[in-house]
Amino acid sequence: MRDFFDLYLQYTKDTEATATFHRWSAIVGIGAYLERNVWVQHGASKIYPNHYVMLLGESGSRKSAAIKGFVRILKEAGYKTLAAEKTSKEKFSADLAAMHHDTNNPDDDLLWGDLDETAITPILIANDEANDFFGLNNIEFLSLLGSWWDYNGTYEVKYKTSKSDSIPNPTPSILVGNTPTNFSLAFPPT
Protein backbone atom coordinates (compact mmCIF):
# COMPACT_ATOMS: atom_id res chain seq x y z
CA MET A 1 0.00 0.00 0.00
CA ARG A 2 1.41 3.40 -0.98
CA ASP A 3 1.28 6.27 1.47
CA PHE A 4 -0.27 9.66 0.81
CA PHE A 5 3.03 11.38 0.09
CA ASP A 6 4.03 8.82 -2.54
CA LEU A 7 0.67 9.28 -4.23
CA TYR A 8 0.79 13.08 -3.99
CA LEU A 9 4.33 13.31 -5.33
CA GLN A 10 3.35 11.00 -8.18
CA TYR A 11 0.37 13.29 -8.87
CA THR A 12 2.62 16.40 -8.95
CA LYS A 13 5.68 14.88 -10.66
CA ASP A 14 5.09 16.61 -13.99
CA THR A 15 4.82 20.10 -12.49
CA GLU A 16 7.69 22.58 -12.40
CA ALA A 17 7.84 22.90 -8.59
CA THR A 18 10.30 20.69 -6.75
CA ALA A 19 9.21 17.60 -4.84
CA THR A 20 10.46 19.34 -1.68
CA PHE A 21 8.08 22.28 -2.21
CA HIS A 22 5.19 19.91 -2.90
CA ARG A 23 5.98 17.75 0.14
CA TRP A 24 6.12 20.73 2.54
CA SER A 25 2.93 22.19 1.06
CA ALA A 26 1.19 18.88 1.71
CA ILE A 27 2.58 18.63 5.27
CA VAL A 28 1.31 22.10 6.17
CA GLY A 29 -2.01 21.60 4.40
CA ILE A 30 -2.72 18.29 6.10
CA GLY A 31 -1.79 19.78 9.48
CA ALA A 32 -4.16 22.70 8.89
CA TYR A 33 -6.94 20.32 7.87
CA LEU A 34 -6.45 18.18 11.00
CA GLU A 35 -6.57 21.27 13.26
CA ARG A 36 -6.46 20.19 16.93
CA ASN A 37 -8.20 16.89 16.30
CA VAL A 38 -4.91 14.99 16.64
CA TRP A 39 -1.81 15.64 18.73
CA VAL A 40 1.34 14.13 20.14
CA GLN A 41 1.56 14.13 23.92
CA HIS A 42 4.86 15.70 25.01
CA GLY A 43 5.07 15.61 28.79
CA ALA A 44 2.29 17.83 30.10
CA SER A 45 1.92 19.53 26.70
CA LYS A 46 0.29 18.57 23.44
CA ILE A 47 1.95 19.18 20.09
CA TYR A 48 -0.60 19.86 17.36
CA PRO A 49 0.01 19.41 13.61
CA ASN A 50 0.02 23.10 12.71
CA HIS A 51 3.29 24.02 10.99
CA TYR A 52 4.96 27.28 10.06
CA VAL A 53 6.78 26.80 6.75
CA MET A 54 8.37 29.30 4.39
CA LEU A 55 9.45 27.94 1.02
CA LEU A 56 12.61 29.82 0.01
CA GLY A 57 13.69 29.92 -3.61
CA GLU A 58 14.66 32.27 -6.37
CA SER A 59 11.97 33.96 -8.47
CA GLY A 60 10.54 31.48 -10.93
CA SER A 61 11.29 28.41 -8.79
CA ARG A 62 7.54 27.65 -8.74
CA LYS A 63 6.99 27.98 -5.00
CA SER A 64 3.59 29.44 -5.78
CA ALA A 65 2.60 26.41 -7.88
CA ALA A 66 3.19 24.09 -4.93
CA ILE A 67 1.39 26.38 -2.46
CA LYS A 68 -1.61 27.16 -4.67
CA GLY A 69 -1.85 23.55 -5.83
CA PHE A 70 -2.32 22.14 -2.36
CA VAL A 71 -4.61 25.00 -1.28
CA ARG A 72 -6.83 24.12 -4.26
CA ILE A 73 -6.98 20.51 -3.03
CA LEU A 74 -7.85 21.68 0.49
CA LYS A 75 -10.68 23.84 -0.84
CA GLU A 76 -12.01 20.92 -2.88
CA ALA A 77 -11.97 18.86 0.33
CA GLY A 78 -14.12 21.49 2.05
CA TYR A 79 -11.47 23.45 3.96
CA LYS A 80 -12.66 27.03 4.43
CA THR A 81 -10.55 28.82 7.05
CA LEU A 82 -8.02 30.60 4.87
CA ALA A 83 -6.52 33.95 5.81
CA ALA A 84 -6.81 37.01 3.61
CA GLU A 85 -3.98 37.65 1.14
CA LYS A 86 -2.94 40.82 2.98
CA THR A 87 -3.83 42.08 6.44
CA SER A 88 -2.55 43.79 9.56
CA LYS A 89 -1.94 42.29 12.98
CA GLU A 90 -5.03 44.02 14.38
CA LYS A 91 -7.35 43.08 11.50
CA PHE A 92 -6.10 39.48 11.53
CA SER A 93 -6.84 39.22 15.26
CA ALA A 94 -10.29 40.77 14.80
CA ASP A 95 -11.08 38.40 11.92
CA LEU A 96 -10.13 35.37 14.02
CA ALA A 97 -12.26 36.57 16.93
CA ALA A 98 -15.17 37.19 14.53
CA MET A 99 -15.17 33.48 13.65
CA HIS A 100 -16.92 32.98 17.00
CA HIS A 101 -19.56 35.70 16.59
CA ASP A 102 -23.08 35.33 15.24
CA THR A 103 -22.72 36.17 11.56
CA ASN A 104 -26.46 36.86 11.31
CA ASN A 105 -26.19 39.65 13.88
CA PRO A 106 -23.61 42.31 12.92
CA ASP A 107 -23.98 43.96 16.34
CA ASP A 108 -23.18 40.71 18.16
CA ASP A 109 -20.60 41.21 20.87
CA LEU A 110 -19.64 38.23 22.93
CA LEU A 111 -20.24 38.89 26.58
CA TRP A 112 -17.80 37.76 29.25
CA GLY A 113 -18.35 34.07 29.85
CA ASP A 114 -20.25 33.43 26.60
CA LEU A 115 -17.21 32.22 24.68
CA ASP A 116 -16.77 28.46 24.39
CA GLU A 117 -13.36 27.95 25.99
CA THR A 118 -13.01 24.58 24.24
CA ALA A 119 -13.54 26.09 20.78
CA ILE A 120 -10.59 26.31 18.45
CA THR A 121 -9.67 29.01 15.98
CA PRO A 122 -7.92 27.37 13.03
CA ILE A 123 -6.59 29.43 10.14
CA LEU A 124 -4.27 28.68 7.24
CA ILE A 125 -2.07 31.52 6.05
CA ALA A 126 -1.20 30.44 2.51
CA ASN A 127 0.48 33.09 0.40
CA ASP A 128 3.06 32.65 -2.32
CA GLU A 129 4.54 36.03 -1.38
CA ALA A 130 5.16 36.05 2.38
CA ASN A 131 5.96 39.76 2.49
CA ASP A 132 2.53 40.59 1.05
CA PHE A 133 0.95 39.03 4.12
CA PHE A 134 3.43 39.86 6.90
CA GLY A 135 4.79 43.15 5.61
CA LEU A 136 8.42 44.23 5.91
CA ASN A 137 10.20 44.15 9.25
CA ASN A 138 6.86 43.59 11.01
CA ILE A 139 8.30 41.89 14.08
CA GLU A 140 5.18 42.58 16.21
CA PHE A 141 2.95 40.60 13.83
CA LEU A 142 5.49 37.79 13.51
CA SER A 143 5.91 37.64 17.29
CA LEU A 144 2.15 37.35 17.73
CA LEU A 145 2.03 34.45 15.29
CA GLY A 146 4.99 32.88 17.08
CA SER A 147 3.20 33.05 20.42
CA TRP A 148 0.10 31.43 18.91
CA TRP A 149 1.92 28.36 17.53
CA ASP A 150 1.41 26.36 20.71
CA TYR A 151 -1.02 28.61 22.59
CA ASN A 152 -3.64 26.92 24.74
CA GLY A 153 -6.58 28.86 26.13
CA THR A 154 -8.28 32.07 25.14
CA TYR A 155 -6.00 34.77 23.78
CA GLU A 156 -7.23 38.23 24.76
CA VAL A 157 -6.53 41.14 22.41
CA LYS A 158 -6.95 44.75 23.58
CA TYR A 159 -7.07 47.49 20.96
CA LYS A 160 -6.30 51.20 21.22
CA THR A 161 -10.02 51.90 20.76
CA SER A 162 -10.76 50.17 24.10
CA LYS A 163 -12.38 47.34 22.16
CA SER A 164 -11.18 43.85 22.94
CA ASP A 165 -11.47 40.45 21.33
CA SER A 166 -11.15 36.89 22.54
CA ILE A 167 -9.63 34.17 20.37
CA PRO A 168 -10.08 30.68 21.78
CA ASN A 169 -7.19 28.29 21.15
CA PRO A 170 -5.68 30.02 18.11
CA THR A 171 -4.29 27.37 15.75
CA PRO A 172 -2.62 29.03 12.77
CA SER A 173 -0.75 27.15 10.09
CA ILE A 174 1.56 29.04 7.77
CA LEU A 175 2.60 28.11 4.22
CA VAL A 176 4.28 30.99 2.42
CA GLY A 177 6.89 31.53 -0.25
CA ASN A 178 9.76 33.98 -0.38
CA THR A 179 12.99 34.74 -2.20
CA PRO A 180 16.27 35.11 -0.31
CA THR A 181 16.35 38.82 -1.23
CA ASN A 182 12.81 39.48 -0.01
CA PHE A 183 13.45 37.39 3.10
CA SER A 184 16.29 39.76 4.03
CA LEU A 185 13.91 42.71 3.57
CA ALA A 186 11.33 41.12 5.86
CA PHE A 187 13.91 40.12 8.48
CA PRO A 188 16.72 42.69 8.31
CA PRO A 189 19.80 42.11 10.45
CA THR A 190 19.65 43.86 13.80
Where are these regions (language model features)?
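Phosphate-handling catalytic cores of nucleic-acid transaction enzymes
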Residues: M1-T190
